[in-house]
Amino acid sequence: MAGVGAVSRLLRGRRLALAGATRGFHFSVGESKKASAKVSDAISTQYPVVDHEFDAVVVGAGGAGLRAAFGLSEAGFNTACLTKLFPTRSHTVAAQGGINAALGNMEEDNWRWHFYDTVKGSDWLGDQDAIHYMTEQAPASVVELENYGMPFSRTEDGRIYQRAFGGQSLKFGKGGQAHRCCCVADRTGHSLLHTLYGRSLRYDTSYFVEYFALDLLMENGECRGVIALCIEDGSIHRIRAKNTIIATGGYGRTYFSCTSAHTSTGDGTAMVTRAGLPCQDLEFVQFHPTGIYGAGCLITEGCRGEGGILINSQGERFMERYAPVAKDLASRDVVSRSMTLEIREGRGCGPEKDHVYLQLHHLPPEQLATRLPGISETAMIFAGVDVTKEPIPVLPTVHYNMGGIPTNYKGQVLKHVNGQDQIVPGLYACGEAACASVHGANRLGANSLLDLVVFGRACALSIAESCRPGDKVPPIKANAGEESVMNLDKLRFADGSVRTSELRLSMQKSMQSHAAVFRVGSVLQEGCEKVSQLYGDLQHLKTFDRGMVWNTDLVETLELQNLMLCALQTIYGAEARKESRGAHAREDYKVRIDEYDYSKPIEGQQKKPFAEHWRKHTLSYVDTKTGKVTLDYRPVIDKTLNEADCATVPPAIRSY
């Protein structure tokens, strides 16, 4: 800590007079004794720049980031964890329903059945090697959380309680509804995040709290760390590391109505894009069936898992018509589309007939109080509804991004060169920021928290396999990160005609109206033009705060740049994909287009060439100067990690 203190005194001694700054800079860093830092004048004389060196740096401190960070520290790596929020403010805290694992506490279960359901739920766009890894690791991951102290809800005999959730079955879809979702009432994400944060405090990890990651530090195709802004004092920090893990979450705030926190701005996704690397499958955006009408707040799928039902204005349990077997527990894309069709056909509820109802008041009050206490409170606050007496008005709301940074099942980031996958040295991703792809075209409920802990741990294990603590950290150029500082300075003094909030709202409303639950070519084309125009309007931004101390105006503008890159790739990918698959439902291309017609026996059929079918991953790139989007494609991985232990699930017609 003596070295850190010396740097702090040096920074304070310089008394840099930045416009709007009213106090000296305070250099804040994690309390690790292993932290090293020194002041650099290589890329800016206007902004204080501090260089650090670690074995590994994790960007993001939600469930995935924390699990990766303390996994590395536990293995002896000198680890930094950089986050724009205090860890327990991360969006993982908002997850309600639970975490899937085939524990078999309610009935016989098998992780291979979970594997089957996840592949089917992905509409056969998920990579089966990664799905194999995740579902096989699920039971041990939940037991690990229990050992960390996570207070799971319990059965009467003391085992972890498991509820029913959408798209989950027994015996490869032939044995009825599975009860596979482990939960802590309806506050599972809150409990998981606090459990992981508490566990992380056992280890010597350096936390850089309220630091905004600006860009990756890339050298010769390798990632060698990140450059970040300290929001507290405006200092710039280059964190050099042999390995970098991106765990920054999703980009739900590209849409007007969503369940995501305002901080879900796709920061990691955008950093990868600016580094010239691809993003994968961003057109697949999950609409959760039950957001509170008018507010967008999440009402967990656990409500339907506990016996809640969706009804229309005629009091009809309409899901029986769309999914005769699973009914209200069909997969999320199926339920969201069914609700939208009910509203379109005039059976919506309310004066405007523009929503449906989620009915819970037929359930015992004691069940609502013990299994769904948070929902009872949320419904009263945001809808004015007493769930023991009235139904909750609900509407599909943007909830999750299936796409993200392409990785393999070890968390290593991939690029696609000459038709082949290549690993990007030194770069990993996990959580919602990543696309492994375990969710494919549609994520099953309660697989997201599982994704976080399984692949956060996988990143740490993968690094421990290939590196050793104290390995030499590769050098970076003296001016590495210079462009990031220039961009920050440009935005800080931006004096155009458009407020950040105005441009952000225009983007969100455009995405909401042009790339919603149902999509059509002409509307998507119009959306592409509109979002491209809005991207161009970034040149006309006006920021008002010229200071550097807690400049939230500047941070929101940096976040808007990130959101725009995500929005561009989402809508261009959606316009190009001329089929319906999972969460991507085209009204002008209503069927799934595979290499074979799986509604018929494939014997005698000729396999479609790769260019003529859509069972493939979209790879998107953006020229950040012009906003031009370029698309490429890579094949889906159908083989599991061990065919003898877990057989591939061949594509089939998907019904519930």
UniProtKB/Swiss-Prot annotation:
GO terms for cellular component: mitochondrial inner membrane; mitochondrion; respiratory chain complex II (succinate dehydrogenase). The keyword Electron transport applies. Pathway: Carbohydrate metabolism; tricarboxylic acid cycle; fumarate from succinate (eukaryal route): step 1/1. The modification N6-acetyllysine is found at residues 171, 174, 242, 327, 415, 472, 477, 490, 509, 530, 542, 590, 600, 616, 625, 628, 639. Pfam families: FAD_binding_2 (PF00890), Succ_DH_flav_C (PF02910). Residues 1-34 form a transit peptide. Oxaloacetate binds at H288, R332, H399, R443, A446. Enol-oxaloacetate inhibits the succinate dehydrogenase activity. Its cofactor is FAD. GO terms for molecular function: electron transfer activity; flavin adenine dinucleotide binding; succinate dehydrogenase (quinone) activity. It is an enzyme of class 1 (oxidoreductase). Acetylated. Deacetylated by SIRT3. Phosphorylation at Tyr-207 is important for efficient electron transfer in complex II and the prevention of ROS generation. The modification Phosphotyrosine is found at Y207. FAD binds at A61, A64, T83, K84, S90, T92, G97, A213, D267, E432, S448, L449. It is a peripheral membrane protein. Keywords: Acetylation, Electron transport, FAD, Flavoprotein, Membrane, Mitochondrion, Mitochondrion inner membrane, Oxidoreductase, Phosphoprotein, Transit peptide, Transport, Tricarboxylic acid cycle, Tumor suppressor. The modification N6-succinyllysine is found at K171, K242, K327, K477, K490, K530, K607. The active site is at R332. Belongs to the FAD-dependent oxidoreductase 2 family. FRD/SDH subfamily. This is Succinate dehydrogenase [ubiquinone] flavoprotein subunit, mitochondrial.
